[in-house]
Amino acid sequence: MTSQKTILLSFDVEEFDLPCEYGFAISKDEQMLVGMQGTLAMQKILTQMDVPATLFTTASFAETWPTMMQQLATKHEVASHSYYHTDFKNEDLLL
């Protein structure tokens, strides 16, 4: 008898805002571009391995890259990760 092992994968698919959290200025355009480049690299690996994942995205990132997000949603679960969390406010949680 063979037992099948399962793993659940989730990724943050968002703007690259980590430098901002440490006081370094990075433009929103650059944040979005770096986030998109990382997302494409992740997507390539998941596609090669034929592995689904849950992708937590900010609405701001999804609005910037709607075509890519629609494409990702055909194979992966896409979930909310607030509107924009660099300068997190309670309003970011509102629908």
Feature names for model-found ranges:
Residues 1-95:
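Catalytic alpha-helical scaffold of carbohydrate-active enzymes acting on polysaccharides/glycoconjugates
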